[in-house]
Each structure stands twice: as C-alpha cells, then as structure tokens.
Amino acid sequence: MADTVLNTTVFDGAKKLITHYNVVSDNSGSTTKIVDVSALASNNGKTCKTVRLNKVSFNVSVTAPADAIRMQWDATTDVVFQTLAGEMEYDYSSFGGLKNTEATGYTGDVNITLPACSNGDSATVVCEWIKVYES
C-alpha cells in the first residue's frame, strides 16, 4: 500500500501559483513533486524557470515531529529549505519570498517529503508561490 496523497494546483496565474497538498500516511513515507515548473502556464511566451515560496499555511500531525514534513528545492542533491511541524503560517512576502538556491542540477521544481512517519500521520500544506521567468 502507499500513502494517500492529494496534490492540487489551485491557481496558476501570470505571477502567482497556489498549491494544496494533503497526505495521510500508511507508514511507508513519500516524496511528492508539488511544483512542476515545466507544467506551469507561461507569461507572454516566457517559460517559468523556478518559484519562490511567498506564504505557507500548514497543519502537520505526525508521531515524530522532530522529522516531520520537509520542503525541498529539486536538484542533483535536493536542498531542504523549510521544515513543517504543527499548525502554523509563514509569510515571506515582505522580502519577496524564499528564493530557490539553484544548487547544482536544479530543475526549478519543488518536492515535499514525509521522511519519518507512522500509519495515520497526516499533513495539509497550502502554498502561495511567486513565479520566476527566464529573462
């Protein structure tokens, strides 16, 4: 059996992207691509190359909160940029959002992983992203 995952693009506009991710674990753990930049709408013919995390709201209910949800910039070696546990909201809009580190082999995509989980652990994560286009 596998984790039950719902990953939805709520809004894909010229400048903003809103995603909704929900998982109920069966104890197997999972990694899900929550942003696939190659599938995003373009803006005046320009292709989205990456995104910045502008705001995130989440409710994470896990047995091992020390190793809860990890958000990662996809690269040759993924870069963890946010760890989520409990119920909170973060707003990074005052400085333009959390920027992709563009590590070696970066794709612009964003992964979310539930590394240490027990049967019934769950999480809901809603993100507002700023789209960054090729020059």
Feature map (PLM): residue ranges:
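Noncatalytic modules at the cell exterior or secretory-pathway interfaces
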Residues: G96-S122
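Short, surface-exposed beta-strand/strand-loop-strand elements in extracellular ectodomains
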Residues: V62-L84
